Swiss-Prot record:
It is found in: Cytoplasm. It comes from the Bacteria. It comes from Agrobacterium fabrum (strain C58 / ATCC 33970) (Agrobacterium tumefaciens (strain C58)). PROSITE patterns: CHAPERONINS_CPN10. This is Co-chaperonin GroES. InterPro entries: Chaperonin_GroES, Chaperonin_GroES_sf, Chaprnonin_Cpn10_CS, GroES-like_sf. Heptamer of 7 subunits arranged in a ring. Interacts with the chaperonin GroEL. The gene is groES. Belongs to the GroES chaperonin family. GO terms for cellular component: cytoplasm.
Length: 98
């Protein structure tokens, strides 16, 4: 997504899903039709932050490059520069991996 000029507003982030393994530990190959969409992703863009009661901008806890876990139904799916991405609020992110 480096070629796009898209920047999310406020406390929103853009997430690229990280694809899960197509094969189980036992060697069984999982077809695409049986896979659930992954709930893990990489942050590719962040907004400037939300405003607190005093009007001061509060920076987000996540940054570009962070690997995160998010809820199954979190975010809005969009296509930017031909790539399928999610736009969600930082509050929809459950945590940072690693």
């Amino acid at each position: 997504m480096t070629s796009t000029n898209f920047r999310p507003l406020h406390d929103r982030v853009v997430v690229r899903r990280v694809e899960s393994e197509a094969k189980t530990k036992g060697g069984i190959i999982i077809p695409d039709t049986a896979k659930e969409k992954p709930q893990e992703g990489e942050i590719v863009a962040v907004g400037s932050g939300a405003r607190d009661e005093a009007g001061k901008v509060v920076a987000l806890d996540v940054k570009v490059g962070d690997r995160v876990l998010f809820g199954k139904w979190s975010g809005t799916e969009v296509k930017l520069d031909g790539e399928d991405l999610l736009i969600m609020k930082e509050a929809d992110i459950m945590g940072i991996i690693g």
